Each structure stands twice: as C-alpha cells, then as structure tokens.
Curated annotation (Swiss-Prot):
Region Disordered, residue ranges: 218-243
Protein name listed in UniProt: Coiled-coil domain-containing protein 22
Keywords: Coiled coil, Cytoplasm, Cytoskeleton, Endosome, Phosphoprotein, Protein transport, Transport, Ubl conjugation pathway
Gene Ontology CC, one term: centrosome
Major location category of this protein: other
Organism: Bos taurus
Domain of life: Eukaryota
GO molecular function: cullin family protein binding
Coiled-coil annotated spans: 323-369, 447-484, 564-595
Localization, UniProt: Endosome; Cytoplasm, Cytoskeleton, Microtubule organizing center, Centrosome
Length: 595
C-alpha cells in the first residue's frame, strides 16, 4: 500500500498539488491537502468545472460545506461509482480517499507529466478551456441554415459577424519630438475612438485609414510624385551635373505630362510658403518675401499648357546657368521654410500647453460650481426649515400641540401598518413552513424510493449472476452427460446399490449376534460407538475453533479499517466544526437582532 500511495502522490504532484515532502502515505493527508488535490485534478481533467472551484479551504463552515458539496457533485458527474458526500472531503478516511484519488488519477490526461509546471497556471487553464470549447464546436454536426433552431443559428450562423462600415478619421500630424500617438487627441481633434459613433465600426475605420496610409507610403517612390522636388533638393553634391540635369528634366516632363495631359481649365495651386505664412501669421510680425526659386516655381506651375510645353523644350537651354546659384537659392529657401515650420510647431506646442492648463482650470471651476450648488441647496433646505419654524413661533403652544398630534397620528399609522403587515406575514410564514415540510417529505420519499430502486438493481444483478452461474453448471452437466457411454443401464447401478445396502444390513445383524454371545465383542462395539461420538464432538470443536478464528480475523480487519478511517480524529474535527458552526450561528443571530 505504501508503494501505491507513493505512486499516487507522485501523480498528484504532477497534476499541480503541493504535497509536502514529508507526506509519504494517504494516512498523512489533511483536509486542506485533500481539497487541494481534488481541485487540481478536476482542473486538469475538466478545466470548465475546475476553474470555478477554489483549492484553498475557506474558514467559514458554511463555505466549507458548499465547497465540499460542489466537489462531490463534480466527481459524481465524472462517473464516480461509489457514494460521495461532503464528509468524504471534510472528514476523509484512508480507504475512501484512496478510491477517490485513484479514480481521479486514472482520468488525468497522458500529457499531464509534460505540463506539470504549467498545469496549475491560469494560462494553461485558459488554453485547455479554449481547446475544449473548440473540440465541442467541432463535434457538433453541421445543420443547413434553413433547418437551424435559434440556438444553432446563434452558434453556427452569422450572428457574430458585423458589416464593414468605415468612417473618415482625422489624426494629428505633428513633426515635433513630443509628437502624440494616433489614439491621443490633438489640440483641436477628438481621440480616434471618439470620432466613430458606432463601436462596431471602429475596427473597420482604423483598417481603412491604415490601408490608405500604406498606399500613400508605397506610392511615394514612383515617378511623378508630389515630393519629387524635395528628393531632388537632397541629391548628393558629388553626383554628376549632367545626371542631375537629366533627372530634373525627366521629373519635370513627367509631372507636366500628368498635370496638363487632359484639356480643361488649369487648377489653382497654393504656394507652400503662403500656407506656412498663413499658419505663422500670429507668431511673426512680418512675412518673409519669396526667393527667386519660389517665384520661379510659382510662375512655372501657373503657366498655360502651351507655355509649359515650350518651357519643357527649353529646359536644356536654361540649364546652362550656374548650378551653384540654383542650389544656394534652394538651400536658402529650405532654411527659411524650416525656420517657419519650427515657429509653427512652437506655437502649436504653446497652444496645446495653454489648452491643457485651461482644461484643468475648467475642471476645477466646474467642481467648485457643483460644490457651491450643493451647498446652496443645503442652505436653501435649512432656510426653508427655519422659515417654517419661524412661522410657527407666534402661536407656539398651539402649533406644538398640533405637531404632537401629527407625531401621534404618524405613530398610530405606523402601528396600524405593522399590524397589517403582521396579519399578512403570519399566513405567509405558515404557508412557507407547510411547503418546506412538504418539500422535506418529498425529498425523504424520493431518497427512500431511490434506495429501493438501488436495492432492486442490486438484486436484479445478483439474480442475473446466479442465473448465469447455473446456466454454466447446466452446460457443464450436459457436456458430462454427452461424454458418458450410452450402453450403461440405470438398472445395473440400482442393483449394485441395493446389494451394498443388503450387505451392510447383514453385517449389522452379524455384529449384533456376536455382541449378544461374546462380552468382549460387546465391549469393543461400545468403545467403537463412544469413539464415533467423541470424534464427532472433536470435529464439531475443530469447526467451532475455525469459525472463531475467522471471526477474529474479520474483527482484526474491521479494526484496521476503522483505524484507517481515523474515526477519533474525525470525531474531534466534527466537534470543532460543530463549535465553530454554533459560534457563526450566534454571530448571525446577534447581527439579525441588532438590525
């Protein structure tokens, strides 16, 4: 048994039970250790059931009984064949505990040893619950949509799908180092989740916005993009002048072909410098004048299509100018634009800081307003009460008598209502007690009938076993009868038996005749009869001794079984739990009386 207990304890440790090293047998298991072992095994076998049970034994007796009943019900649901109740967990005996833990250990999964370190973790329990839920869904048969019940329509239909409705999102575009995230609000923008009124459309809106950003990012590397001027301004200085001129000419031709290829009115374009000047008008007193590069760029983009085409053809002629002047003008213009952009960013950051400060001040002012409103309401109530008291002062005695009458009438009304409530409460309590008594009687009757049904099942099984055994004996006798020779007659056996009986009778008659004639023969016959009688007594004594020895062994086994059940320790635990339960009941009664 000790070797089997060690193997069982090793299985419990693999399932996640913290069994102390000094515990080597099930006899040393405490109530707390039994509850923890059963809960850990249930969590590994069925995470959906075990996750709702606590491995720690609560302090309150009512909570202990509820936990023990839940464990018993969970084990019975798994198919435990024996009787199981709360006493098997709170006051365990060694044989019952061994049967229960062996039953649970047999149902542990084969890979429990591999997941020994993670079997008691919340992540492992969650993964097992997800896997069991997926297996349950895969085990369900597929039903056509027109034949589905409402429950199947919810499980297998399209109830969890949402239509793809996207809304336009506006995100802050800041270039400073303290740039906010996409989900945060800008100085004049709401947060991204608040811009979508429907919660179901938030994911669709974010997906569409990110797809647009991805398309814009991948399209920037193509010829004819809008930022070709910025890329040409960042060309390395060591590159050949002819290659730079050819690349610039190619970009200009491609851009003009895309812009003026279709007939129609020319589009009006705003200069980047004008936009930045409009943003930075409040921060800078004067607007910087455009450089020669800016004016030439503006003039280039505002020409007619014929002039643009002519200018494209004249690019090789004008490209003979000194390249250094062009690069210097571009660098100067870029530097001025950077300064303006930094000024705009600085102004935006200052405005954001001011808005945050104003928001905090606004919250404080609103809080003070609410507090002042509450204080005003309280003062109005106190003023109203004092004004009513002042109105009653001129005729104080009469008003006091009226108030006394009102108080007495209110007290009488309360007493009357209490009497009416008592009239309604008494029959309801009587009916409740009657129904509770009927329920108890029904439960007793159902338990009695259940016991009778179980006894009938056992008797049916015993009768079936007896019938099966007799059927086997009958088949054996039939086979022996078939093996006997067919020519043997029953008459020969009967005659032989009659001859033996006749010989015995003759021998008795001869012995009686000899005993009458000879005294020695008579004494020998008497001694033989006494010897037969003593032998029968000796045989009876030996049989009684064997029966007593069997009873002694049975009693020893019962004593060992009772010692294994730890009856005395369980009785001590029951007494302690009874005292704790009485203390809890007394505390609850005291609270009820105080309430």
């Amino acid at each position: 048994m000790e070797e089997a207990d060690r193997i069982l304890i090793h299985s419990l440790r693999q399932a996640g039970t913290a069994v102390p090293p000094d515990v080597q047998t099930l006899r040393a298991f405490t109530t707390e250790l039994v509850v923890e072992a059963v809960v850990r095994c249930l969590r590994v076998i069925n995470p959906a059931v075990g996750s709702g049970l606590s491995p720690l034994l609560p302090l309150a007796m009512s909570a202990r009984f509820r936990l023990a009943m839940s464990l018993a019900q969970a084990c019975m649901d798994l198919g435990y064949p024996l009787e199981l109740g709360y006493q098997n967990f709170l006051y365990p005996s060694e044989p019952d505990l061994r049967d229960l833990l062996l039953f649970l250990a047999e149902r542990l999964p084969t890979d429990a040893s591999e997941d020994a370190d993670q079997s008691a973790g919340e992540s492992a329990i969650l993964l097992r619950a997800i896997g069991s839920r997926i297996r349950d869904h895969l085990a369900l048969p597929w039903v056509p949509p027109l034949l589905r019940t409402p429950k199947l329509q919810y499980l297998q239909g399209s109830a969890h799908q949402k239509p793809f409705h996207a809304s336009r999102l506006v995100m802050p575009e800041l270039s400073s180092r303290g740039e906010s995230r996409e989900f945060q609000a800008g100085p004049l923008l709401l947060p991204v989740p608040a811009q979508v009124p429907q919660p179901a459309a938030r994911a669709a809106s974010l997906l569409e916005h990110h797809a647009i950003q991805l398309c814009q990012h991948t399209g920037r590397d193509r010829a004819g993009d809008e930022d070709w001027g910025h890329r040409t301004s960042r060309l390395p200085a060591q590159e050949d002048t002819r290659a730079q001129r050819q690349r610039l000419q190619k970009h200009l031709a491609e851009h003009l072909r895309q812009t003026w290829g279709r007939p129609g009115p020319p589009q009006q374009a705003r200069d980047l410098g004008e936009v930045l000047q409009a943003w930075g008008a409040g921060a800078r007193p004067g607007t910087p004048k455009g450089s020669r590069f800016t004016h030439s760029k503006k003039f280039t983009f505002h020409l007619e299509p014929e002039a643009q085409a002519a200018q494209v053809s004249d690019v090789p002629a004008t490209s003979q100018r000194p390249e250094q002047d062009t690069w210097a003008a571009q660098e100067q213009e870029l530097e001025s634009l950077r300064e303006q952009l930094e000024g705009v960013n600085h102004n935006i950051e200052e405005v954001e800081a001011n808005m945050k400060t104003l928001g905090i001040n606004l919250v404080q002012v609103e809080t003070e307003c609410r507090q002042s409103e509450l204080s005003i309401v309280e003062r109005e109530q106190a003023l109203r009460l004092k004004s009513q008291a002042v109105e009653l002062l001129p005729d104080g005695a009469a008003n006091l008598a009226k108030l006394q009458l009102v108080v007495e009438s209110s007290a009488q009304r309360v007493i009357h209502l209490a009497g009416q409530w008592e009239k309604h409460r008494v029959p309801l309590l009587a009916e409740y007690r009657h129904l509770r008594k009927l329920q108890d009687c029904r439960e007793l009757e159902s338990s009695r009938r259940l016991a009778e049904i179980q006894e009938l099942h056992q008797s049916v099984r015993a009768a079936a076993e007896e019938a099966r055994r007799k059927e086997e004996v009958y088949k054996q006798l039939v086979s022996e009868l078939e093996t006997l020779p067919k020519d043997v007659s029953r008459l020969a056996y009967t005659q032989r038996i009659l001859e033996i009986v006749g010989n015995i009778r003759k021998q008795k008659e001869e012995i009686t005749k000899d005993a009458k004639k000879d005294d020695a023969v008579r004494k020998a016959y008497k001694y033989l009869a006494a010897l037969h009688e003593n032998c029968s007594q000796l045989i009876q004594t030996i049989e009684d001794t064997g029966t007593i020895m069997r009873e002694v062994r049975d009693l020893e086994e019962q004593i060992e079984t009772e010692m294994g059940k730890k009856t005395l320790s369980n009785l001590d635990k029951i007494r302690e739990d009874y005292r704790a339960l009485r203390q809890e009941n007394a505390g609850l009664l005291g609270r009820v009386r105080e309430a």
